[in-house]
Design a protein with these regions (language model features):
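Positively charged
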Residues: 1-136
């Protein structure tokens, strides 16, 4: 179900709690909300739809990837960029990495590891920051 985007900075500044299998419904809510905002959005974290759980979604090409309890394992190739966010107005400078490796659980609660480069890596890092309460 599509959800309203949270813009409350105090709420977004809180560290998200680990997800469990009871939170699998968030995959559909995040997917529906991402699709509804596809003109201006390429990724979301669960706190952006009002749920303080460690769940993110982002587009990897045409395929939305949902990650439960993602953990950044490694990063390489730092660079400076500017990003926007549905929860904020405007763009802000930030540091990102060209290549990252992330472990997570998928929608079937299976452990996965993925290496991302370029724009998908940037999106994933942005959403991982949301889980830590870091706002660009």
């Amino acid at each position: 179900m599509e959800k309203k985007i949270v813009k409350d900075i105090l709420f977004l500044s809180q560290v998200s709690q680990p997800a469990n299998q009871d939170d699998l419904y968030l995959a559909r809510d995040l997917q529906d909300t991402l699709l509804a905002n596809r003109e201006t959005c390429v990724g979301l974290a669960a706190n952006m739809i009002g749920v303080q759980k460690r769940v993110i979604i982002f587009n990897l090409g045409l395929v939305p990837v949902v990650m439960f309890n993602p953990v950044l394992l490694s990063s390489d190739g730092p660079y400076e960029t500017e990003e926007g966010c549905l929860s904020l107005v405007g763009v802000r400078p930030t540091k990102r990495y060209e290549t990252i490796r992330v472990s997570y659980r998928d929608s079937k609660w299976q452990e996965q590891t993925i290496t991302l480069t370029g724009f998908p890596a940037q999106i994933c890092q942005h959403e991982l920051d949301h889980l830590e309460g870091r706002i660009i």
